[in-house]
Amino acid sequence: IMKVVIIGGVAAGTKTAAKLKRENPNDEVIIYTKSKDISYAGCGLPYYVGGAVESDEELVVNTPEKFTALTGVSVYTEKEVTALNSGNKTITVNGENVSYDKLVLAVGAEPVIPDVKGVNLDGVFTVREPADAVKIKNYSENAKKAVVAGGGFIGLEMAENLMEKGISVTLIDMASQLMPDVFDSEMADLIRRKLQEKGLRVVLGTTLNAVIGDGKVSAVQTTSGEIPADMVILSVG
């Protein structure tokens, strides 16, 4: 009997755990994740903010309890792995050492936070997990102007959903067109014009230099000038 520990509980972690347990039912398979949710729909986060997804519970594909009942995999949420010793095959979880026979790292990516002044102010958010979407939705109830930094899928969807709430949104991106890895310049220009027709302000070829505010955000400083903002969404990668 083998003990397999998986660090990370979203798509890759849960899929790997379920497959390992299915192929080797007698093995002990354990997931540790620092999030409180597992197996959530990241693409749905902006639509929870906009109200199309009504409850944050709808974002969670599987609860830990459901996943364990379904697969036999043990799941520990809000448990952060802080050290790994491959020599003696142990990890440190919340200060305790846990042994393993095989270890799978499925930690995903952390949101990129630009190295600029003011990103820790109230009203500045990244978008990665359901808890982020809940914070953004709550904060947006009192916002009138938002800046979204980053014109990828999540950035565009966040801009769309904030506009649905009646918020005036400016989207900035350092690229000279929207989504250069996906669209050619002609298609990107068509999309930009359509978004502008809907009321989105799009500022391209622009870098975020600083977030301005006293305790909470009031504007952003960019290479194109200062833009007023009650809230800022960082979706730069």
Regions found by a protein language model. Name each.
Residues G8-A11, R128-E129, G150-G152:
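Glycine-rich Rossmann-fold phosphate-binding loop(s) that bind the pyrophosphate
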Residues M2-V5, V60-V147, A219-V236:
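FAD-binding core/adjacent interface of flavoenzyme oxidoreductases
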Residues A12, D37, A83, P111-V112, ...:
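Surface-exposed, flexible loop/turn segments at secondary-structure boundaries
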Residues M2-S74, N161-F183:
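Beta1-alpha1 glycine-rich phosphate/pyrophosphate-binding loop at the start
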Residues K135-F183, V217:
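Rossmann-like NAD(P)H-binding beta-loop-alpha module
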Residues G13, G42, P46, P64, ...:
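A general structural signal for well-ordered alpha-helical segments in protein cores
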Residues N26-I30, L70, V75-T92, V98, ...:
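A Rossmann-like FAD-binding core segment of flavoenzymes
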Residues T16-A17, A41, S86, P114-V116, ...:
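Short glycine-/acidic-enriched loop or helix-start segments at secondary-structure transitions
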